[in-house]
Swiss-Prot record:
SUPFAM superfamilies membership: Ribulose-phoshate binding barrel
Protein name: Orotidine 5'-phosphate decarboxylase
Record has Lyase as a keyword: yes
Active-site positions on this chain: K95 (proton donor)
GO MF entries: orotidine-5'-phosphate decarboxylase activity
Enzyme Commission identifier(s): 4.1.1.23
Pathway assigned to this chain's UniProt record: Pyrimidine metabolism; UMP biosynthesis via de novo pathway; UMP from orotate: step 2/2
Keyword Lyase: yes
Originating organism: Cupriavidus necator (strain ATCC 17699 / DSM 428 / KCTC 22496 / NCIMB 10442 / H16 / Stanier 337)
Example GO BP: 'de novo' UMP biosynthetic process
Family: Belongs to the OMP decarboxylase family. Type 2 subfamily.
Alphabetized UniProt keyword annotations: Decarboxylase, Lyase, Pyrimidine biosynthesis
Catalytic activity: orotidine 5'-phosphate + H(+) = UMP + CO2
């Protein structure tokens, strides 16, 4: 199955638009795992097992693994998700952006080393920086468009021919870049008006939406702005609020409770 097919199936099977971000901060891991060998993998595995029936995707953030020299644990984690929970796509949050052979090697890293189902990329260097990823026809390429951080406005709201830059990115994705149907866009939950504008531009293209939970994005506004006609179309990401619901031995159960509550809140507004 392609990434988009897996995602659509997971939306239906788990009745969920929730994506759980896997951002394992060693300073916040449960006390029972502190200092243990393979702690990052063990922590993420427990979170995955506790939430896999509640999500449409998992999104490991590559920097949290690389900074701890835990690339092997990231490989192990993605393999584990595919083996233990088949059909749940894994988005490698790498935000890569380069050209030529460097981009080719970043694509190799994402799709042949880590075997991710999709990867996040930056469009700043243009379409040729994305082409190596699109050469993998069964994988997804999720392009930064309107990010959830306040500083994103410094660039993304620059006016070009009377339009903010983020809108031009969305238009380029719709009109020129997404010819193979592999592409999605990142649009932050902290900016629901922009979510609505991007949805208007790109039709049913999947949107990865960070910014709920710890970043304070409003779920109702996010869902109503970004849902497609069938009540899907989004991967609404929550990381810290779920991962660090508890540092005690009940951390996985606590994470599940927060994930369940988040999914239920999202679903309350999907068809309303």
């Amino acid at each position: 199955m392609t990434f988009t097919e897996q995602l659509a199936a997971a939306w239906q099977r788990n009745d969920s638009l929730l994506c759980v971000g896997l951002d394992p901060d060693p300073q916040k891991l449960p006390l029972s795992l502190t200092g243990a060998g393979g702690a990052i993998f063990s922590f993420c595995r427990e979170i995955v097992d506790a939430t896999a029936d509640l999500v449409c995707a998992f999104k490991p953030q590559i920097a949290y693994f690389h900074s701890q020299r835990a690339e092997d644990q990231l490989e192990q984690l993605i393999h584990y998700i595919h083996d233990a929970h088949p059909g749940i796509p894994v988005i490698l949050d790498a935000k890569r952006g380069d050209i030529g052979s460097t981009a080719e090697h970043y694509a190799l890293e994402a799709f042949e080393r880590y075997h991710a189902d999709a990867v996040t990329v930056s469009p700043y260097m243009g379409f040729d920086s994305m082409q190596p990823y699109l050469a993998y026809p069964d994988r997804g390429v999720i392009v930064l468009c309107r990010t959830s951080n306040p500083g994103g406005s410094d660039v993304q709201f620059l006016q070009v021919d009377g339009k903010p830059l983020y809108q031009l990115v969305a238009e380029a994705a719709r009109e020129r870049w997404n010819t193979t149907g592999q592409m999605g866009l990142v649009v932050g939950a902290t900016f629901p008006n922009e979510i609505a504008r991007v949805r208007q531009i790109v039709g049913d293209m999947p949107l990865l939406i960070p910014g709920i939970g710890a970043q304070g994005g409003d779920i109702e506004a996010t869902v109503k702005a970004g849902r497609t006609a069938d009540g899907t179309g989004m991967m609404i990401n929550s990381s810290r609020a779920i991962l660090y619901a508890s540092r005690e031995k009940d951390f996985a159960a606590a994470a599940r409770n927060v994930a369940l509550q988040t999914r239920e809140t999202i679903n309350r507004y999907r068809h309303g």
